[in-house]
Amino acid sequence: HATLRRQRQMCIRDRFSDIIANRQINRLWVVGSNNDTANLIDQSYKRYLSLMEKHLKCLPFMFGQRPSSSDFALYGQLTQLVGFDPTPRNIAYQISPRTVSWVNVMSDLSGLHDSGGIGEFFGVQSKKKDNNKLNYFEDNDYGWIDTNNIPDSLIEIFNEVGKVYIPCLIANAKAYEKGDEIWETSIDGALWKQKTFPYQAKCLKWIKMEFDKLSANDKKSTLDLISGSGCESILE
């Protein structure tokens, strides 16, 4: 009976394994992943890892000595690429061990409270002592990079995003506005074709809305930072 039970369990496991694998593989075209774009995706991922390796040699986080929302956004993607999928994980280990370590660090940024919290680790002095609030970074600009002295590594990351991802974001938004189910565009000399995603169109809209909320000086600082990278196109 025990042998039969194990055999049934293995059959069920294999069946669900095939179902899940086929479901994910068959959805690759939806996000633009196919034989035509494979090399583009592969090369961009490797370039990004090389740029991250360079950047993390100088700074522990994207914009300085403390994590920003951008760090957590990148972390969310990299948890899958570095910590789950074996193919991109192996590439990451070869090209950028610092990125692998960074993902692990980001996974354990706990303790944003007062005494002994991670705020003290970053050298940030809390202005309000309240153990019930994550208040170390409230109204505190400590640790951000000087916008007048942006590291080349960060500029190069923006350039990669502007070259590969921003054209996708813009083309998807235009297709969504027109009601097109599928769109295509040229990215770094390769044809990119995929299904239109409403969520990405909303993301682009949110970015513009948040940019419009900035003061005139902050808008100028932002544009100065990304000017020439291609990223400024999403704010037009």
Name what the model sees in each region.
Residues H1-I12:
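Single conserved hydrophobic/aromatic residue that forms the stacking wall/gate
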Residues M62-V82:
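GST superfamily/GST-like fold recognition
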Residues L28-W29, S33:
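Globin-like tetrapyrrole-binding proteins
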Residues N39-K46, F63-R66, Y93-S96, V100:
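Conserved structured core elements
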Residues K54-F63, L112:
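Surface-exposed helix-capping loop/turn segments at secondary-structure junctions
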Residues Y75-D188:
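Active-site/pore-lining binding-face segments in mid-to-C-terminal subdomains
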Residues S186-E236:
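C-terminal non-catalytic accessory extensions
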Residues R13-Q24, N35-M52:
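All-alpha helical catalytic cores of prenyl diphosphate-utilizing isoprenoid enzymes
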